[in-house]
């Protein structure tokens, strides 16, 4: 049947968050199937979904491509009925973006919250020129009120005004349409047909109902008439709409006239990168070339040979041809600013393939040491903008981000969005609430989900939760939750990707406020930006750079040597590689995970390139392609190095030699996978580019699978071994989950070596800096401290007479300084982080500067002083920036604001002891004027030892103090009134209680490990210590117990869970196979202390695992860690345990009692990764 021409202009997608029940892509396919002339995407106050629909039009599976209209459904705060707005042309589209930006930004005096859009009807008229407006009448409407709105719109410069007619399917549709037709005629506007679509197919109706319940915070049972009355609000074919509007055929025909009026398409967004200021008489390209050759001279001097010169010339020529000089100057400027402020930074990703980026100081991969593939970074065949990722110190990255805003103005710079999708946990929770399941049921179902990703809940997981998977309500909840997964929940800001434009960015895309102060972000994510060929600059954060900078500062302040990143050469120290070969990498960047620690003794890195391979090899790509074991066998001379080749009549036998020779004939990197597709499967440049983009789409593995048949069949047809062809593509699919290109691995390997060098030569500074950079990495403070002590570093307790806010170094007579724990280690203790304070002061200056400027016009914000951005010395720490970081911990004694002293308890202590030493707790309390809560926290952390008080004595002494520090006039009177309880000696606190109290207050203990006090109990059960596990013969069955440090369930491990247990002797590595995991899911996921029974698995390199067969949750044993419960020794009349400040006595109410006498958590939770 020939389709009846019809255009649906009223489509709501799931980017009208919790309003629409289908993806934009689904609408495009459904419209193509129905043969619709056009569809109009009009989400609620947003353009967030339009690029998804636009990109889907290029899908090869579409036989017919309907015209796509890009608009928004304006939902007003003043009660005006919704209006669909479609821009006629590019200029009108820009005005629509600016209108939505107004609603999302507000003003400095009336800031709009993230995710909100506040628009009044009057706002529309400032941007109405060139817009096609469709008034959407509510279910019940007043004809006079609608007539007045239509008249007002008709008198405006709008391109056209229409009244929408839609059916409610409630029995009075013909009468209602007749009223609307009369109203349209009297207002002299056309009536236009729409089904006011909420989902693409009727089968989505149930999910739509659930979304409505979630939005309205109601259950299916209670929501009543707020649900749609039927399943008719789906996309309908033209003949069906013509039948429904048979009394008003002109309304159908009007949809085509409406569509013809619109000439705008996203193809018309001609992106222009902002110009960069250059010296007088210079072009951007000329200035870039001057900087490049100056940098080459700085880095290489007389060693700048002809080969490297040719590489630089080739890159500069391509940059000139593609007109990318401004982009490189932007990134160079940002990096130079950061370095002028003493902020460590380093580029990574495909940009590390560029020699120009290296000599500009953007990346750290020396082009003379690594064979670079510049074409992976920039290629004229791809015609895609370059993408330079730069990592900055995590604690100071915000300074760089604010510099970008002020450098370009908020009207030309904004962060891209990240779409936050429903994942299994959130989906089952929200669906369960909507269906009326109890909180207990939804929680137990959600708790069976490991990590954030997955397709839904299996029957096994439902049974694990103690529920019946065949129960109709449970089954429906699980099915709907599976459908909801991948639906967008809301927009958030990207971790650091900026879009910059020459003209107004808000003429391309709406800009809204982020949750963080002084951040704004656009509505499109990185995939949307890439689809429109817009350049972005990634200003990313890396915790290890913060740790390295703090290590350098500590070394300079305490050892007299100032290091910068370039001082540490990766070929200098064999001892560092020997340390890594032993798997001693706790705290080291990228190689501290369980899998990496196990790989290090097998790989035995000896050179920098070995570190590049180490970083890349423990990734889903090589693992899923089964490339790891062949590489290790060849590296260890257990297997001959061969290179796959085609049959003689299809090509030379060495066609893959250049691709694979550095990795012994085994593909490990993304670049190699792409080259194999070109060389062995003979992909065209377009196909190879599509494959590259698919590999770069993190976790979007579905896009890679479409290339599988062609690549594998092509390779087999050319004579390649089928197993090799299949494994190559399995590797590529792994890259779709997560994989590293060689250039990226090389950038990270630089930091692997630097952090390893610090760990080996300066373990004191490295430990201190790691603690001061938390939270980061795999391991908690207790393990960081334990590792440092094992390596000869003395760790000293927190003490009010010696500690600062941060952990610090103190001189000793030994080889290393001692690490003095700081007040920041005490949970709940108030102290001010100077990096954060610097950013706060900067933000206040920015807001003050812009306060008088209305953001409704969004002009460029006047730059706040960022002196130092043009510093000639990139390593200089002494800039003119008023908010420079403190050089050492003594600087922390001076707060940036006097009124901050009230909130900075650490600062009060330091200032008081500068005036005179503390002699007693009462003296300390008077001099510091700390609140009683602060004194209790210090006492609970055992921080009064220098005053002769242990934890228990200090707690009792604090409890004797008045609640408020008295004025001196009343001190004597109060002292006379205080009973002299100190005269009665308190019994010593048992050591097990001290250890537990340490873990509860500072997350570590220097006095012992909880397991050593349980050792006798476990030894009686035949349980081995962790140290003995590592010395046990292969395949022997044993039992082991320990505190759970880390749980990992990598996506590449096919459901295998890895656990790391710790006791007083060391750690043990546990492997839990999927079947065991399903049987003991509760123990694996929830236990703090676990007993494992299983068999030893030992490799020739003595990498030992315990393969679990049975697990027992022994967390309850931790409650025994008070001496009376372990050994039943009486303590007399005084309390046996210290008193916590939230402790309440409820001796008469058993329901208030808890399992442990301290009424707080026994041990911190493990760190779980997936």
From Swiss-Prot:
Reaction catalysis annotation: DNA(n) + a 2'-deoxyribonucleoside 5'-triphosphate = DNA(n+1) + diphosphate
Keyword terms of this UniProt record: Cytoplasm, DNA damage, DNA repair, DNA replication, DNA-directed DNA polymerase, Nucleotidyltransferase, Transferase
Q: State any single GO MF term.
A: 3'-5' exonuclease activity
Annotated stretches, region: Disordered: 867-899, 1129-1170
* Functional summary from the UniProt entry: DNA polymerase involved in damage-induced mutagenesis and translesion synthesis (TLS). It is not the major replicative DNA polymerase.
Q: Which family does it belong to?
A: Belongs to the DNA polymerase type-C family. DnaE2 subfamily.
Its name, as the record gives it, is Error-prone DNA polymerase
> Which organism is the protein's source?
Bradyrhizobium sp. (strain ORS 278)
């Amino acid at each position: 049947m020939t389709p009846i021409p019809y255009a649906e202009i009223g489509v709501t997608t799931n980017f009208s968050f919790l309003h629409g029940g289908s993806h934009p892509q689904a609408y495009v396919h459904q419209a193509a199937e129905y043969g619709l002339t056009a569809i109009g995407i009009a989400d609620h106050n947003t353009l967030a979904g339009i690029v998804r629909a636009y990109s889907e039009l290029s899908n090869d599976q579409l036989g017919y491509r309907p015209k796509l209209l890009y608009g928004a459904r304006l939902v007003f705060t003043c009660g005006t009925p919704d209006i669909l707005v479609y821009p006629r042309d590019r200029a009108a589209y820009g005005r629509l973006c600016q209108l939505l930006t107004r609603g999302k930004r507000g003003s400095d005096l009336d800031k709009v919250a993230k995710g909100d859009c506040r628009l009044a009807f009057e706002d529309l008229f400032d941007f109405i020129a060139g817009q096609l407006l469709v008034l959407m009448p509510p279910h019940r409407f007043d004809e006079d009120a609608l007539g007045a709105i239509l008249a007002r719109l008709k008198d405006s410069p709008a391109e056209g005004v229409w009244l929408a007619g839609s059916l409610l399917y409630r029995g009075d549709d013909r009468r209602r349409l007749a009223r609307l037709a009369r109203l349209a005629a009297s207002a002299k506007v056309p009536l236009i047909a729409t089904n006011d679509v909420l989902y693409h197919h009727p089968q989505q109706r149930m999910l739509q109902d659930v979304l409505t319940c979630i939005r309205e915070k109601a259950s299916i049972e209670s929501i009543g008439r707020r649900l749609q009355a039927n399943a008719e609000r789906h996309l309908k074919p033209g003949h069906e709409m013509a039948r429904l509007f048979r009394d008003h055929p002109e309304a159908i025909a009007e949809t085509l006239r409406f569509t013809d009026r619109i000439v705008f398409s996203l193809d018309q967004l001609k992106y222009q990168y902002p110009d960069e200021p250059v010296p007088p008489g210079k072009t951007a390209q000329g200035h870039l070339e001057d900087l490049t050759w100056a940098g080459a001279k700085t880095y290489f001097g007389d060693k700048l040979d002809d080969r490297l010169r040719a590489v630089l010339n080739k890159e500069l020529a391509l940059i000139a041809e593609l007109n990318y000089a401004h982009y490189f100057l932007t990134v160079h400027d940002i990096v130079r600013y950061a370095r002028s402020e003493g902020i460590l930074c380093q580029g990574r990703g495909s940009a590390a393939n560029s020699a120009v980026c290296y000599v500009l100081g953007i990346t750290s991969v020396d082009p003379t040491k690594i064979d670079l593939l510049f074409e992976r970074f920039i290629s004229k065949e791809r015609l895609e903008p370059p993408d330079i990722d730069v990592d900055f110190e995590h604690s100071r990255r915000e300074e760089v981000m604010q510099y970008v805003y002020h450098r370009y103005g908020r009207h030309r710079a904004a962060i891209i969005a990240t779409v936050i999708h429903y994942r299994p946990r959130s989906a089952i929770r929200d669906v369960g609430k909507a269906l009326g399941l109890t909180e207990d049921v939804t929680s137990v179902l959600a708790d069976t989900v490991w990590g954030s990703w997955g397709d839904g809940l299996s029957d096994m997981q439902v049974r694990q939760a103690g529920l019946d998977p065949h129960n109709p309500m449970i089954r429906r909840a699980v099915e709907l939750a599976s459908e909801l997964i991948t639906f967008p929940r809301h927009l958030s800001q990207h971790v650091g990707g900026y879009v910059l434009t020459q003209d107004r960015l808000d003429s391309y895309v709406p800009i809204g406020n982020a949750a963080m102060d002084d951040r704004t972000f656009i509505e499109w994510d990185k995939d949307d930006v890439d689809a429109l060929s817009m350049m972005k600059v990634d200003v990313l954060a890396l915790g290890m750079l913060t740790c390295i900078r703090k290590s350098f500062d500590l070394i300079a302040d305490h050892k007299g040597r100032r290091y910068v990143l370039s001082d540490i050469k990766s070929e200098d120290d064999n001892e560092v590689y020997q340390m890594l070969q032993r798997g001693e990498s706790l705290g080291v960047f990228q190689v501290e995970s369980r899998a990496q620690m196990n790989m290090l003794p097998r790989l035995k890195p000896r050179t920098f390139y070995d570190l590049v391979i180490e970083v890349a090899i423990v990734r889903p790509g090589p693992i899923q392609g089964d490339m790891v074991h062949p590489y290790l066998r060849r590296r260890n001379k257990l297997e001959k190095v061969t290179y796959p080749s085609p049959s003689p009549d299809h090509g030379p036998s060495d066609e893959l030699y250049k691709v694979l020779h550095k990795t012994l004939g085994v593909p490990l990197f993304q670049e190699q996978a792409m080259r194999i597709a070109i060389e062995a499967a003979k992909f065209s440049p377009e196909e190879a580019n599509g494959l590259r983009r698919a590999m770069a789409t993190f976790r979007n593995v579905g896009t890679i699978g479409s290339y599988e048949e062609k690549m594998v069949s092509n390779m087999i047809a050319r004579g390649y071994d089928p197993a090799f062809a299949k494994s190559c593509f399995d590797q590529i699919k792994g890259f779709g989950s997560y994989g590293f290109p060689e250039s990226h691995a090389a950038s990270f390997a630089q930091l692997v070596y630097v952090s390893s060098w610090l760990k080996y030569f300066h373990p004191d500074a490295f430990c201190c800096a790691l603690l001061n950079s938390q939270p980061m990495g795999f391991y908690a403070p207790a393990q960081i401290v334990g590792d440092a002590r094992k390596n000869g570093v003395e760790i000293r307790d927190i003490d009010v007479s010696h500690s600062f806010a941060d952990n610090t170094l103190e001189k000793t007579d030994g080889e290393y300084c001692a690490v003095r724990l700081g007040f920041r280690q005490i949970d709940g203790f108030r102290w001010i982080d100077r990096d954060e304070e610097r950013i706060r002061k900067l933000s206040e200056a920015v807001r003050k500067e812009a306060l008088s400027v209305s953001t409704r016009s969004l002009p460029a914000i006047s730059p706040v002083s960022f002196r130092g951005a043009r510093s000639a010395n990139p390593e200089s720490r002494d800039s003119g920036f008023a908010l420079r970081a403190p050089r050492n911990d003594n600087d922390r004694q001076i707060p940036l604001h006097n009124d901050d002293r009230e909130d900075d308890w650490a600062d009060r202590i330091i200032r008081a002891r500068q005036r005179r030493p503390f002699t007693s707790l009462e003296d300390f309390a008077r001099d510091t004027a700390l609140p009683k809560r602060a004194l209790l926290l210090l006492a609970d952390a055992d921080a009064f030892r220098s005053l002769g008080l242990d934890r228990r004595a200090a707690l009792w002494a604090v409890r004797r103090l008045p609640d408020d520090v008295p004025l001196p006039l009343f001190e004597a009177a109060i002292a006379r009134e205080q009973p002299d309880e100190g005269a009665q000696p308190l019994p010593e606190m048992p050591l097990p209680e001290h250890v537990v109290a340490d873990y509860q207050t500072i997350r570590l203990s220097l006095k012992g490990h909880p397991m050593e006090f349980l050792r006798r109990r476990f030894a009686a059960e035949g349980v081995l210590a962790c140290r003995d596990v590592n010395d046990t013969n292969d395949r022997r069955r044993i039992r082991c117990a320990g505190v759970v440090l880390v749980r990992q369930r990598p996506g590449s491990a096919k459901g295998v869970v890895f656990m790391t247990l710790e006791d007083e002797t060391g750690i043990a590595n546990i492997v839990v196979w999927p079947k065991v995991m399903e049987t003991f899911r509760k123990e694996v996921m929830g236990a703090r202390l676990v007993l494992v029974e299983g068999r030893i698995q030992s490799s020739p390199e003595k990498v030992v695992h315990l393969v679990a067969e049975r697990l027992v949750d022994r967390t309850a044993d931790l409650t025994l860690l008070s001496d009376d419960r372990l050994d039943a020794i009486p303590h007399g009349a005084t309390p046996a345990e210290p008193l916590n400040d939230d402790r309440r006595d409820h001796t008469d109410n058993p329901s208030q009692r808890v399992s442990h006498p301290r009424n707080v958590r026994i041990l911190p939770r493990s760190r779980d990764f997936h």
